[in-house]
């Protein structure tokens, strides 16, 4: 049975882990790093993913895609704030979805995420030495149904069967509690990542990890902290120079990179200098941006964001029926929890210093790997049980446009619940089931996750027909809803899959394209590797020709130089089919020549050895003669020719 890998599909960075011998292992990528930037770049016909994509972002801002997680499963109208912040083009797709426009080719957020997942999949396969087809993928605890479904679709497009969707704070708690499964404790997981914020309250005991409540904000994270710095720098430059950097995509990409770097530096320093030379030319003269940003100024700029974390924490405690004093440990997850003022705020909320015993960048992937091992029946983990919750209430629209809840927020999943409703008018032949997710009393203020009709209701006065509506949430938090007329037995159901905006046919097409692109990426890498190898052979051959010099016979040297010229021409033309043949020809010629040189040297050494033997005999005779000529004086002389 193949391994089930754990993937933390993050807004800013992603990470992959696997269980080996009962221990979680975070797998380094091809660049040797434990985390991979969640960035995809389109460069001509090639795609770059991760660090290579990040390195070229400044010079290719409109085709470098980052923070795609913020668009997953969201309607186009809801992501306008995000669209205003990014340099790449996002347009409206079908079913009010978002699409990334790259030279007229429209990509869904799921497709972009799938490219990142493919990178994670390949990283795991290179490490394990075998194909990987199954994964546990993490999502923010406060992700809604459409966002979870979009994540499952991204996995499917990437060629992965998603065995389980697990909430990020829950995954972190699994990783934290792996060595503490026998202890009874209540923990709070404060997860502030690149684009989302979650707070979950869990109870651990006897190998059971039970989520008591969760809360959060799917549009609050490190990106927002970066953006307050970006706004500050752009405003400073406009105040000093009268120019708006926001109109220049390349300048904004440089500001983004500088803001992220400054934010990180301010976690360990009280001030940092942001120095961006040649940020914008004005009348042919270069303008530079040099600003000193202090930690206190950054905290002032971020004050609203910091305060935004307080209310979800208080709601999570209330939802769990606990107070801050009941919490034994606070776990910090996500790179943004390294910000000192965030740690101070967490200490204020819970009245105790948060634990720093886990790596905030890797712990979620580790937890996902543990969940994968649990699902595969890993005997090393004993009897570990995970009980998660649904983050938001679910219900339907009823008379008066109100939302009637069937499943309350923080209900343990999987869960199934039914309730009976009736008609609002006499002889009503059908009813529309409008499925909603959220906490507001009016239907219009909550999120629509699906609609369907139940037809064929027998004519009857208002209030007589009995319509049984059933909600079923699986372990991934994905919703199915059914409606049944008790009188006729007629039933209609819907699995909320289309809420992410993709049909089965679209997913199939995207999966086929992803497979084809993966093959194209492999071929592109092989092409680059072959050209690099040819370049290396050219360099080494020229070096050896120079080192051997006159030792190489003239005819052999001319032959090698002619073949070398052919290789240079093939390299320039990128004639991959010829390169291997020419390199083999050079290697064979050099091998034969090296053998000849070796044989010639060996023969020379043998001749020298024979001469030395003769010389020794002569020396012995001379010594005897010297004994008879003691009056002869030995002198050194140099023969002049």
Swiss-Prot record:
Asked if the record carries the keyword Nucleotide-binding, the reply is yes
One GO MF term? unfolded protein binding
Claim: Nucleotide-binding is one of the keywords in the record? yes
| Record's signal peptide | none
CDD domains annotated for this entry? ASKHA_NBD_HSP70_DnaK-like
Gene3D superfamilies reported for this sequence: 1.20.1270.10, 3.30.420.40, Actin, Chain A, domain 4 (3.90.640.10), Substrate Binding Domain Of DNAk, Chain A, domain 1 (2.60.34.10)
The similarity comment for this entry is: Belongs to the heat shock protein 70 family.
Q: What is this protein called?
A: Chaperone protein DnaK
The organism named in the record is Azobacteroides pseudotrichonymphae genomovar. CFP2
